[in-house]
């Protein structure tokens, strides 16, 4: 079995195990365009319980390239076409406004291409204001960004399905290491505040994402990302999806790392849910720590650190974002 076929089989098996809807035709189209990319970049399989606890399955990859190859491949393969909406030109504007060190793409296996990521070096959030087609609500939240220390921009995405955009921030400020910070920022948007136990997990969050769209003046969602270096460190008792995926998720490593996104929004926008990615090749979690200038808690837990030093930097720059 080739590595591409193994990945495809693992993806379908995850969908079946979690009861996630999928389309063989959609998966075929995704793998025809991007299958080879999944074999040698930061690749992850994700499950998330966003639709009334129904689990969805996504796959994503990131690659250290200055140009956005995903946009070209998606257009050529029929996964992306114009919608008569600002999302049509937004990713190109992002790459023109802010130099990139990497890009990425995210796919729903029952839908197709969902997002394309733009990954620069960490830059001031003001750099994003130069992007012409961003929703006006982004600029309108300058005071919000200042108040909550969301000033170090580390990634942007275009969501083609939901017609929205995400800004990702490096959580570098001491206040972001407190539970009160997460209570305050969620309450500021009238989003649900999680349990004290989850709040204690969030204080170790290196990355905060904020979602905006063109149809609303407010913030659509917020998500806080945490990384875990192996199956045992995932807080499996918090949610059955976390437990099942941490124990069963396939990977080329015996004991892979995981990224967990704790996502919050108003009830009308799917409320609160969890998303968890398995680091299939052992590149995603080290890249995540590297991107945020953090030491990997257990270096030996991921094979990337066994590579020759000249390869390690290249591999760490194959960043995968949420």
UniProtKB/Swiss-Prot annotation:
<feature type="binding site">
    <location>
        <position position="115"/>
    </location>
    <ligand>
        <name>dimethylallyl diphosphate</name>
    </ligand>
</feature>
<feature type="binding site">
    <location>
        <position position="168"/>
    </location>
    <ligand>
        <name>dimethylallyl diphosphate</name>
    </ligand>
</feature>
<feature type="binding site">
    <location>
        <position position="60"/>
    </location>
    <ligand>
        <name>dimethylallyl diphosphate</name>
    </ligand>
</feature>
<keyword id="KW-0808">Transferase</keyword>
<comment type="similarity">
    <text>Belongs to the aromatic prenyltransferase family.</text>
</comment>
<comment type="function">
    <text>Prenyltransferase involved in the biosynthesis of ambiguines, a family of hapalindole-type alkaloids. Catalyzes the reverse prenylation of hapalindole G or U at the C2 position with dimethylallyl diphosphate (DMAPP) to generate ambiguine A or H, respectively. In addition, accepts hapalindole A, an epimer of hapalindole G, and catalyzes normal prenylation at its C2 position.</text>
</comment>
<dbReference type="Pfam" id="PF11468">
    <property type="entry name" value="PTase_Orf2"/>
</dbReference>
<dbReference type="InterPro" id="IPR033964">
    <property type="entry name" value="Aro_prenylTrfase"/>
</dbReference>
<feature type="binding site">
    <location>
        <position position="166"/>
    </location>
    <ligand>
        <name>dimethylallyl diphosphate</name>
    </ligand>
</feature>
<protein>
    <recommendedName>
        <fullName>Hapalindole dimethylallyltransferase</fullName>
        <ecNumber>2.5.1.159</ecNumber>
    </recommendedName>
</protein>
<feature type="binding site">
    <location>
        <position position="46"/>
    </location>
    <ligand>
        <name>dimethylallyl diphosphate</name>
    </ligand>
</feature>
<feature type="binding site">
    <location>
        <position position="221"/>
    </location>
    <ligand>
        <name>dimethylallyl diphosphate</name>
    </ligand>
</feature>
<feature type="binding site">
    <location>
        <position position="225"/>
    </location>
    <ligand>
        <name>dimethylallyl diphosphate</name>
    </ligand>
</feature>
<dbReference type="GO" id="GO:0004659">
    <property type="term" value="F:prenyltransferase activity"/>
</dbReference>
<dbReference type="InterPro" id="IPR036239">
    <property type="entry name" value="PrenylTrfase-like_sf"/>
</dbReference>
<feature type="binding site">
    <location>
        <position position="275"/>
    </location>
    <ligand>
        <name>dimethylallyl diphosphate</name>
    </ligand>
</feature>
<keyword id="KW-0637">Prenyltransferase</keyword>
<dbReference type="InterPro" id="IPR020965">
    <property type="entry name" value="Prenyltransferase_CloQ"/>
</dbReference>
């Amino acid at each position: 079995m080739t590595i591409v076929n193994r990945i495809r089989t693992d993806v379908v098996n995850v969908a079946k195990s979690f009861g996630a809807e999928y389309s063989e035709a959609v998966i075929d189209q995704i793998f025809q365009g991007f299958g080879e990319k999944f074999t040698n970049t930061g690749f992850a399989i994700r499950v998330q319980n966003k639709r009334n606890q129904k689990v969805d399955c996504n796959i994503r990859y990131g690659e250290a390239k200055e140009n956005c190859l995903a946009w070209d491949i998606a257009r050529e393969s029929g996964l992306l076409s114009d919608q008569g909406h600002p999302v049509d030109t937004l990713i190109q504007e992002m790459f023109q406004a802010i130099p990139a060190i990497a890009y990425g793409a995210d796919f729903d296996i029952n839908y197709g291409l969902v997002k394309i990521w733009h990954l620069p070096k960490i830059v001031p959030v003001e750099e994003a204001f130069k992007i012409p087609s961003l929703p006006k609500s982004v600029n309108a939240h300058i005071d919000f960004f200042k108040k909550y220390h969301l000033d170090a921009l580390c990634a942007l995405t275009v969501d083609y399905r939901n017609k929205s955009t995400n800004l990702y921030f490096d959580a570098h400020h001491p206040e972001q290491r407190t539970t009160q910070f997460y209570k305050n920022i969620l309450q500021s948007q009238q989003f649900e505040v999680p349990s004290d136990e989850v709040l204690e997990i969030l204080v170790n969050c290196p990355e905060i994402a904020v979602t905006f769209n063109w149809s609303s003046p407010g913030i659509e969602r917020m998500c806080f990302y945490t990384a875990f270096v192996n199956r045992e460190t995932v807080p499996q008792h918090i949610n059955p999806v976390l437990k099942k995926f941490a124990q069963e998720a396939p990977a080329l490593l015996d004991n892979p790392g995981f990224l967990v996104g704790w996502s919050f929004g108003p009830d009308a926008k799917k409320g609160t849910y969890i998303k968890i990615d398995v680091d299939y090749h052992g590149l995603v979690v080290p890249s995540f720590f590297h991107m945020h200038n953090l030491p990997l808690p257990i270096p030996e837990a991921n094979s990337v650190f066994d590579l020759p030093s000249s390869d390690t930097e290249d591999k760490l720059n194959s960043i995968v974002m949420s």
